[in-house]
């Protein structure tokens, strides 16, 4: 079950070893654990709904509370300390674009405020309910979560906007395709949410940011539908897709998103490299990008993040041995970790990795190999779970 006042599934957690705890205490001082607010106390303070009964709308307090907050630091503090914000008066769960249209017509006729909701991972305050004299309706799109159409000829896939990342990939991979969009919130964020927030994924170097992947779709606005055909190009006039990208629900509710997909790569691997310092690391990454090698990912950590990641990883004996080897090779204090990925056919992947290593060596890089990369890939979406662990130890962390 998803945590009501923290990140992710309550069956998943990330532990911090003694080394990581000692580092926190040395850098930040002792933690100050607090007493969390009780969910029951918050629910008891929720005012009655101002919405009438409707078959698509729930007025249950527990559901209204869940829709009122995202995952920003401010949201986190409100949940943990029981600072109850304004909550929606009801939550609708449409299963089709037609039901979204019905809800918007109803809201328009009765002057209700509408806030779209899907993955609930917003960190920019776009789920906040303002103080309002009229009712506020949250429209939860998570039941619109299917692959609606796959055009293999044009490599276009149409999804219900509430389809979360794991379902996007599972439904595409069943047909031999991938979208290749992997934000850190992948576990819960949705394809529609990616579009309306202009999301960037961890492998955007290969597949492109969401604005490059978004080919068209359908948005229901208060005054009618906005249909965006999947024309490959236009020589004149504004691109309606640009109105939707980054719109955060201001113009309407995206109900369908058509995205450009790619056949699954024959080979995919991730590789860890270390560079002596930030200046050389930055220059090396710039050179790699400008060389336009067919890499799928370049993820550079500065010295502090590198030290933190290695400490959090545990395996103190293995990490210690690696640190000694890196120091012997010229990467000691202030070193920066670069994680690079290749996602292509095997021949292209070998060529890209060979050329990348050759270029990186000019900047003093030390290649460690795919073992650390595989470990990173296996845990790539678990980073936000550290927020729960840190809070229990008395530290607050933003995204």
What are these regions (language model features)?
Residues 1-105, 123-155, 307-312, 373-399:
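N-terminal flexible segment immediately upstream of the FAD-binding catalytic core
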Residues 53-79, 282-399:
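C-terminal substrate-recognition/cap domain of FAD-linked oxidoreductases
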Residues 90-95, 270-276, 338-342, 399:
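Short, well-ordered beta-strand elements within core beta-sheets of diverse protein domains
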Residues 139, 215-219, 242-246, 252-261, ...:
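Short beta-strand elements
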Residues 145-301:
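FAD-binding subdomain of flavoenzyme oxidoreductases
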């Amino acid at each position: 079950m998803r945590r009501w006042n923290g990140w992710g599934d309550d069956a998943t957690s990330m532990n911090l070893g003694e080394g990581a705890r000692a580092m926190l205490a040395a850098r930040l001082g002792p933690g100050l654990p607090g007493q969390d607010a009780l969910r029951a106390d918050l629910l008891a303070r929720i005012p009655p709904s101002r919405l009438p009964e409707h078959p698509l709308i729930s007025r249950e307090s527990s559901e209204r509370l869940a829709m009122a907050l995202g995952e920003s630091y401010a949201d986190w503090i409100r949940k943990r300390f029981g600072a109850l914000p304004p909550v929606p008066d009801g939550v609708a769960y449409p299963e089709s674009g037609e039901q979204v249209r019905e809800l918007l017509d109803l809201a328009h006729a009765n002057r209700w405020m509408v806030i779209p909701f899907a993955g609930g991972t917003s960190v920019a305050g776009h789920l906040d309910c303002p103080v309002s004299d009229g009712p506020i309706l949250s429209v939860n799109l998570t039941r619109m979560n299917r692959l609606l159409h796959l055009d293999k000829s044009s490599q276009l896939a149409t999804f219900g906007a509430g389809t979360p990342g794991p379902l996007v990939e599972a439904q595409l991979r069943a047909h031999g395709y991938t979208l290749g969009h992997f934000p850190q919130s992948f576990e819960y964020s949705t394809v529609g949410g990616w579009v309306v927030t202009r999301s960037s994924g961890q492998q955007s170097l290969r597949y492109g940011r969401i604005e490059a992947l978004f080919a068209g779709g359908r948005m229901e606005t208060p005054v009618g539908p906005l249909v965006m055909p999947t024309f490959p190009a236009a020589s004149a006039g504004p691109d309606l897709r640009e109105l939707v990208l980054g719109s955060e629900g201001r113009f309407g509710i995206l109900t369908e998103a058509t995205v450009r997909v790619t056949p699954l790569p024959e080979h995919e691997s991730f590789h860890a490299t270390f560079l002596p310092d930030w200046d050389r690391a930055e220059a090396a990454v710039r050179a790699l990008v400008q060389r336009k090698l067919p890499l799928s990912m370049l993820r550079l950590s500065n010295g502090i993040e590198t030290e933190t990641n290695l400490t959090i990883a545990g395996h103190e004996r293995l990490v210690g041995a690696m640190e000694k080897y890196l120091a012997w090779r010229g990467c000691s204090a202030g070193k920066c970790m670069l994680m690079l990925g290749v996602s292509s056919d095997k021949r292209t992947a070998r060529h890209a990795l060979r050329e990348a290593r050759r270029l990186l060596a000019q900047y003093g890089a030390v290649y460690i190999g795919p073992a650390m990369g595989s470990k990173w890939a296996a845990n790539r979406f678990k980073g936000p779970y550290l927020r729960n662990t840190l809070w229990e130890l008395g530290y607050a962390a933003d995204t």
